[in-house]
Protein backbone atom coordinates (compact mmCIF):
# COMPACT_ATOMS: atom_id res chain seq x y z
CA UNK A 1 0.00 0.00 0.00
CA UNK A 2 1.73 3.18 -1.21
CA UNK A 3 -0.95 5.83 -0.61
CA UNK A 4 1.11 9.06 -0.43
CA UNK A 5 0.76 10.20 -4.01
CA UNK A 6 1.55 13.86 -3.38
CA UNK A 7 5.32 13.26 -3.25
CA UNK A 8 5.62 11.24 -6.46
CA UNK A 9 8.22 12.24 -9.00
CA UNK A 10 7.08 13.55 -12.37
CA UNK A 11 8.73 12.58 -15.64
CA UNK A 12 9.98 15.33 -17.93
CA UNK A 13 8.38 13.48 -20.85
CA UNK A 14 5.31 12.12 -19.13
CA UNK A 15 2.54 10.24 -20.88
CA UNK A 16 0.01 12.77 -19.60
CA UNK A 17 2.04 15.62 -21.09
CA UNK A 18 2.68 13.88 -24.43
CA UNK A 19 0.18 16.01 -26.35
CA UNK A 20 2.17 19.11 -25.45
CA UNK A 21 5.71 17.81 -25.96
CA UNK A 22 4.86 15.93 -29.18
CA UNK A 23 3.18 18.98 -30.73
CA UNK A 24 5.68 21.48 -29.38
CA UNK A 25 9.10 19.89 -28.73
CA UNK A 26 10.69 23.24 -27.69
CA UNK A 27 8.30 23.29 -24.72
CA UNK A 28 10.46 20.59 -23.11
CA UNK A 29 13.48 22.89 -22.89
CA UNK A 30 11.36 25.96 -22.16
CA UNK A 31 9.78 24.33 -19.12
CA UNK A 32 13.10 23.32 -17.52
CA UNK A 33 13.60 24.98 -14.15
CA UNK A 34 9.96 25.94 -13.80
CA UNK A 35 8.56 24.61 -10.56
CA UNK A 36 5.79 22.05 -10.92
CA UNK A 37 3.06 23.88 -9.02
CA UNK A 38 0.07 21.97 -7.83
CA UNK A 39 -3.47 23.29 -7.68
CA UNK A 40 -6.28 22.50 -5.28
CA UNK A 41 -7.92 20.62 -8.15
CA UNK A 42 -4.85 18.43 -8.67
CA UNK A 43 -4.54 17.87 -4.92
CA UNK A 44 -8.19 16.83 -4.74
CA UNK A 45 -7.62 14.37 -7.59
CA UNK A 46 -4.52 13.03 -5.85
CA UNK A 47 -6.57 12.49 -2.70
CA UNK A 48 -9.20 10.59 -4.73
CA UNK A 49 -6.42 8.30 -6.01
CA UNK A 50 -5.14 7.69 -2.49
CA UNK A 51 -8.65 6.87 -1.25
CA UNK A 52 -9.24 4.48 -4.15
CA UNK A 53 -5.94 2.76 -3.38
CA UNK A 54 -7.12 2.27 0.21
CA UNK A 55 -10.26 0.51 -1.08
CA UNK A 56 -8.19 -1.64 -3.47
CA UNK A 57 -5.85 -2.58 -0.62
CA UNK A 58 -8.86 -3.88 1.30
CA UNK A 59 -10.37 -5.75 -1.66
CA UNK A 60 -7.27 -7.16 -3.32
CA UNK A 61 -4.14 -6.72 -1.26
CA UNK A 62 -4.89 -8.15 2.18
CA UNK A 63 -5.61 -5.00 4.19
CA UNK A 64 -7.82 -5.99 7.12
CA UNK A 65 -11.17 -4.33 7.77
CA UNK A 66 -9.76 -2.98 11.04
CA UNK A 67 -6.78 -1.41 9.23
CA UNK A 68 -9.09 -0.02 6.54
CA UNK A 69 -11.45 1.53 9.11
CA UNK A 70 -8.57 3.14 11.00
CA UNK A 71 -7.07 4.60 7.81
CA UNK A 72 -10.49 5.67 6.52
CA UNK A 73 -11.12 7.69 9.70
CA UNK A 74 -7.90 9.59 8.99
CA UNK A 75 -8.98 10.16 5.39
CA UNK A 76 -12.28 11.61 6.58
CA UNK A 77 -10.29 14.36 8.32
CA UNK A 78 -8.54 15.36 5.09
CA UNK A 79 -9.51 18.78 3.74
CA UNK A 80 -10.49 17.23 0.40
CA UNK A 81 -12.74 14.54 1.81
CA UNK A 82 -16.45 14.86 1.04
CA UNK A 83 -19.34 12.46 0.73
CA UNK A 84 -19.47 13.34 -2.98
CA UNK A 85 -15.83 12.32 -3.43
CA UNK A 86 -16.32 9.13 -1.38
CA UNK A 87 -19.34 8.14 -3.50
CA UNK A 88 -17.42 8.84 -6.72
CA UNK A 89 -14.47 6.73 -5.55
CA UNK A 90 -16.75 3.91 -4.42
CA UNK A 91 -18.44 3.93 -7.85
CA UNK A 92 -15.01 3.78 -9.50
CA UNK A 93 -13.95 0.90 -7.23
CA UNK A 94 -17.21 -0.94 -8.03
CA UNK A 95 -16.52 -0.47 -11.76
CA UNK A 96 -13.02 -1.88 -11.32
CA UNK A 97 -14.43 -4.82 -9.35
CA UNK A 98 -16.87 -5.51 -12.20
CA UNK A 99 -14.00 -5.46 -14.72
CA UNK A 100 -11.94 -7.73 -12.44
CA UNK A 101 -14.81 -10.23 -12.20
CA UNK A 102 -15.21 -10.17 -16.00
CA UNK A 103 -11.49 -10.93 -16.25
CA UNK A 104 -11.93 -13.87 -13.86
CA UNK A 105 -14.72 -15.22 -16.04
CA UNK A 106 -12.30 -15.29 -19.01
CA UNK A 107 -9.42 -16.89 -17.15
CA UNK A 108 -8.61 -17.66 -13.51
CA UNK A 109 -5.09 -16.35 -14.06
CA UNK A 110 -5.75 -12.61 -13.64
CA UNK A 111 -3.02 -10.03 -13.27
CA UNK A 112 -4.30 -6.89 -11.55
CA UNK A 113 -2.08 -3.92 -10.74
CA UNK A 114 -3.15 -0.85 -8.79
CA UNK A 115 -1.41 2.55 -8.81
CA UNK A 116 1.67 1.06 -10.43
CA UNK A 117 4.66 2.99 -11.73
CA UNK A 118 5.19 2.19 -15.42
CA UNK A 119 8.61 2.54 -17.04
CA UNK A 120 8.09 3.94 -20.54
CA UNK A 121 11.83 4.46 -21.16
CA UNK A 122 11.90 1.85 -23.93
CA UNK A 123 9.70 4.18 -26.00
CA UNK A 124 10.61 7.61 -24.63
CA UNK A 125 13.90 8.07 -22.74
CA UNK A 126 13.48 8.80 -19.02
CA UNK A 127 9.71 8.57 -19.29
CA UNK A 128 7.43 6.92 -16.80
CA UNK A 129 3.89 7.21 -15.56
CA UNK A 130 1.38 5.59 -13.24
CA UNK A 131 -1.18 3.00 -14.23
CA UNK A 132 -4.20 3.55 -12.01
CA UNK A 133 -5.60 0.07 -12.66
CA UNK A 134 -4.27 -2.51 -15.11
CA UNK A 135 -6.08 -5.83 -15.53
CA UNK A 136 -4.82 -8.61 -17.80
CA UNK A 137 -6.63 -11.89 -18.36
CA UNK A 138 -7.20 -14.28 -21.24
CA UNK A 139 -5.33 -12.11 -23.73
CA UNK A 140 -7.34 -8.98 -22.81
CA UNK A 141 -5.62 -5.94 -21.34
CA UNK A 142 -7.74 -3.28 -19.64
CA UNK A 143 -6.40 0.04 -18.43
CA UNK A 144 -8.73 1.98 -16.17
CA UNK A 145 -7.96 5.59 -15.31
CA UNK A 146 -9.48 7.50 -12.41
CA UNK A 147 -10.27 11.11 -13.23
CA UNK A 148 -11.46 13.32 -10.41
CA UNK A 149 -11.13 17.00 -9.78
CA UNK A 150 -12.15 20.22 -11.32
CA UNK A 151 -10.52 23.12 -13.06
CA UNK A 152 -8.91 21.55 -16.12
CA UNK A 153 -10.66 19.30 -18.60
CA UNK A 154 -8.79 16.04 -19.10
CA UNK A 155 -9.30 13.65 -21.98
CA UNK A 156 -8.63 10.01 -21.21
Task: Place the predicted regions along the sequence by residue.
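General structural signal for secondary-structure boundaries
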Residues: 11-15, 81-86, 154
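A non-catalytic, helix-rich entry segment at domain boundaries
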Residues: 43, 47-121
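Mg2+/Mn2+-dependent nuclease catalytic core
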Residues: 106-156
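Accessory terminal regions of nucleic-acid processing enzymes
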Residues: 1, 53, 57, 153
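Nuclease catalytic cores
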Residues: 10-60
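Generic start-of-chain signal for non-secretory N-termini
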Residues: 1-11
Amino acid sequence: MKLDHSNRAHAKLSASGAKQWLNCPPSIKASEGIADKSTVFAEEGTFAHELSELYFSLKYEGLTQFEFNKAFQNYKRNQYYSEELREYVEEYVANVEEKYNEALSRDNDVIALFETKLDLGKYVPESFGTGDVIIFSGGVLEIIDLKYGKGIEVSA
